[in-house]
Curated annotation (Swiss-Prot):
Promotes RNA polymerase assembly. Latches the N- and C-terminal regions of the beta' subunit thereby facilitating its interaction with the beta and alpha subunits. GO terms for biological process: DNA-templated transcription. This is DNA-directed RNA polymerase subunit omega. InterPro entries: DNA-dir_RNA_pol_omega (IPR003716), Pol_omega/Rpo6/RPB6 (IPR006110), RPB6/omega-like_sf (IPR036161). PANTHER family: DNA-DIRECTED RNA POLYMERASE SUBUNIT OMEGA (PTHR34476:SF1). The RNAP catalytic core consists of 2 alpha, 1 beta, 1 beta' and 1 omega subunit. When a sigma factor is associated with the core the holoenzyme is formed, which can initiate transcription. It comes from Hyphomonas neptunium (strain ATCC 15444). NCBIfam families: rpoZ (TIGR00690).
Amino acid sequence: MARVTVEDCIQKVPNRFELVLLAAHRARMIREGSPLTIDRDNDKDPVVSLREIAETSIDLKVVKEALISNLQDIRPGEENEREADRVALQAAPAATEDDVLRAYQAELESGRDDRL
């Protein structure tokens, strides 16, 4: 079992915080069935993910993209809802300035005063 240190990984990912995020996400990917790129050697998933990073046996861009897409909160069909809202807003009748002034004048003439 080869010992992996943070110094080995920092050479590949200079930011420690990014390293932790990438290694944790890669460990989750392994747990969910992603194929290993190195021998497990009886190591746990987080250690395997760090070893993969240290040995550059995985594409970190792929892991980073998977992490980002996993963190995005998009419901299925949300894009369709947004597009439907845009279409509805464009199709809605828009009140002109004259329409607003006429409605205001009619309200004034009716003597309604809802203010208290």
